[in-house]
Amino acid sequence: NKQAAKFYYYQLHTERGKQGYDYLNGRGLSDDTIRKFGLGYSDKYGSLLYRFLKEKGYDDEILRQSGLFLADEVHGMQDKFWNRVIYPIMDANSRVIGFGGRVMGDGKPKYLNSPETKIFDKSRNLYGLHLARSSRRKNLIICEGYMDVISMHQAGFNNAVASLGTALTSLQAGLMKRYTDEVLVIYDSDEAGVKAALRAIPMLKGVGLTTRVVNLRPYKDPDEFIQHEGCEAFEKRLEEAENSVLYEIRMKERDFDLADPQGKSDFLHEAVRRLVAIEDEIERNSYLEAVAGKYGIAVEVLRKQVGQMALSGAGRTERVKPRNTAANKKEKEGGVEKAQKLMLTWMTSYPALIGKLEKYITPEDFTTPLYRQIAEMIVLQYHEGGVNPAKLLNQFVDSEEQKEV
């Protein structure tokens, strides 16, 4: 991997790599940033890296295990990455363990990652952590993509990291906990980014991390925000990051009509469920006061509701449905979950179906967070060369989740 990274970096600075260099330069990256992250390029010819490494003395079996090549019966070993800007992925100790590639032009898939190997496990690593771990800033920033991390580091926010093409895992959250007690979540401001943030928050809080969410609106991502507003404005957004519990409650507003008395009542019941989940009484009381003040309800009324729901256990088992939406019966929910589970089984057993299904179904269509996460992993593995059920199972450390998977 180290030799491959050197090769890609060299290629970026040749005439063949001009397209890749122009792309990175067009995204505002300096030569120093390109060097710091070891960015490179793999050109349109699909065997240059293979020939380079063969000349270095590597045999085919080692190259096959590296994840850098695809074996073709007709053409032999072909480079996995071609016509792409290359992002070397390093572990916390700065060892190159894999690569990400962004296609030049309109080819598919737009982004391609190394498959999992003996040294590369996406669920246990974070892009940019080898640099962020040395930051003097008190927290870490978790964002979505390579360019988000790179642009933030270039702008001076050198505490940014990103998950590697998958939803944030508990192992990645635990990895961040080694270096900080607080994480700022900066995902894209679109609907997909909001859903990703809501899935990440429990992972982060589950390992004891204080978690806040940064508002990027009206811009989509950190790179776009910094380009338009500058570093000082971005720093201000970091300082104003919203407490994750209040963010979760605010996001629930979208499902209710707060101008309607019944809608507001249903929303507040849903907010109460979130407050019930807070075990520490002092912490819960602080949130009670904040929610009561924001939504104009007496603290004692809210406290009484939380107490009643906590005693009944309803906060853990029931969901208030938004007004004017169809209420699904348990039998119907069970049928939907069974159908989705069957779909995941088909996708795992017959990966060739995935290419056809993608036109009609995306991971976001799965209604339960666990099934949605599994679907994302299956599709990612498919685009990286093959679906491996054993590796899917290993992504889940929770025994109940493993049993369900």
Question: For each of these PLM feature ranges, what is it?
Answer:
Residues 39, 51, 288-291:
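Substrate-binding/catalytic subdomain of NAD(P)-dependent oxidoreductase enzymes
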Residues 1-35:
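Non-catalytic interaction/clamp surfaces of large macromolecular machines
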Residues 91-92, 133-140, 167-183, 187-405:
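A charged alpha-helical hairpin associated with nucleic-acid processing machineries
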Residues 30-31, 59, 298, 367:
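Helix N-cap / loop-to-helix initiation motif
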Residues 21, 34, 50, 299, ...:
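Short, well-structured alpha-helical segments
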Residues 17-22, 47, 146, 269, ...:
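A generic alpha-helix surface/boundary motif
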Residues 1-4, 22, 43-179, 183, ...:
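Phosphate-handling DNA/RNA-contact segment within nucleic-acid enzymes
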Residues 1-4, 8, 24, 38, ...:
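Short alpha-helical scaffolding segments that buttress acidic/His motifs in well-ordered protein cores
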